[in-house]
Amino acid sequence: MKKWMAAVFVMMLMLCFGGIENVKAAEPKVYQFDFGSGSMEPGYIGVRASDRYDRSKGYGFQTPENMRDVAASGAGVKSDAVQFLAYGTKSNNTFNVDLPNGLYEVKVTLGNTARASVAAEGVFQVINMTGDGAEDTFQIPVTDGQLNLLVTEGKAGTAFTLSALKIKKLSDQPVTNRTIYVGGDSTVCNYYPLNSSKQAGWGQMLPHYIDKHTFQVRNMASGGQIARGFRNDGQLEAILKYIKPGDYFMLQLGINDTNPKHKESEAEFKEVMRDMIRQVKAKGADVILSTPQGRATDFTSEGIHSSVNRWYRASILALAEEEKTYLIDLNVLSSAYFTSIGPERTLGLYMDGDTLHPNRAGADALARLAVQELKRQGIAGF
């Protein structure tokens, strides 16, 4: 009798866990999806644009009629993709995966795209990935038993495509690790490939100087951004969804805000920045304001680099004092460094023919100066 019961038990286990295509069956710690109509790579679950979400499988597209299989120019999982024909952070045209509640690491591999962002759970997760086959990784807590993700703008009028997803469970607790969120413009944002791009923002290089066992860095900066846009267009919303006590929000804006085409006065800039500071502090997190560095050519005839009157710097200094935030006067710190190395070497830290945007070495130097200043001030965690 005992042997018969044991045999029945084994058969039940086989029925429950036998289906490799059912992501819910064995509740693996890692889920890998290969999107598109091409051949499926080993170790991945193949997903076509027509695959509608099915509770019995535990994955699929919410509205497959708004998806399309497309080719991609890479190899392996990067050889094909799916295109999102409907998009937006609030769109229901999502790829859904049933997951036990907890904290997950999600690696996203795009198909062919000029510039696209990744959204999940109704907010941006990665901003403006560029180039064919671009890859990035982010942490996300799952609290309702399902991850809902899509690829979205990006650059209007271009294709938003997804080649592969790798989802890895980190913890049973649906809370992000301690995080430094970064806001800013093209001198701060990420460029792709992250580990080898010629151009870089200092937010991209920040992890080189941060203890990864203490913090993760989430860079939500984007090229061309102004304070009003960062607050109103979804980037601040994404930060406010997850930021918590013990986290930091590093914010550097002002360069594009001074451009007359944006019709943003210095007074408006200051009040929008103040509003963002207060919203973040209401979540129990700390704010670190940073003043933008100057141009490579801001040298006097005596060889002194100085740009203290650029980019609404005075308003940023005043805000730090009025709102009791931390401050990195990166404008002055970088000028002192540029003066020490001279005009020629300073120019070598910027993109060719461009006196505003740092190259990879320049962004690395700015990130190093920023973290050195935080350590000098004795700010917790640095």
UniProtKB/Swiss-Prot annotation:
Which InterPro entries does this one have? AGA-YXIM_GBD, Galactose-bd-like_sf, RhgT-like, SGNH_hydro, SGNH_hydro_sf
Q: Which Gene3D superfamilies match?
A: Galactose-binding lectin, SGNH hydrolase
For this UniProt record, the keywords arranged alphabetically read as follows: Hydrolase, Signal
What EC number(s) is this enzyme filed under? 3.1.-.-
Active site at S186, D354, H357
- The source's domain of life comes to Bacteria
* Molecular function via GO: hydrolase activity
Q: Where is the signal peptide?
A: 1-25
UniProt cross-references to PANTHER family, sorted A to Z: PUTATIVE (AFU_ORTHOLOGUE AFUA_2G17250)-RELATED, RHAMNOGALACTURONAN ACETYLESTERASE
Its family?
A: Belongs to the 'GDSL' lipolytic enzyme family.
Protein name according to UniProt: Uncharacterized esterase YxiM
What is the originating organism of this protein?
Bacillus subtilis (strain 168)
Species lineage:
Bacteria, Bacillati, Bacillota, Bacilli, Bacillales
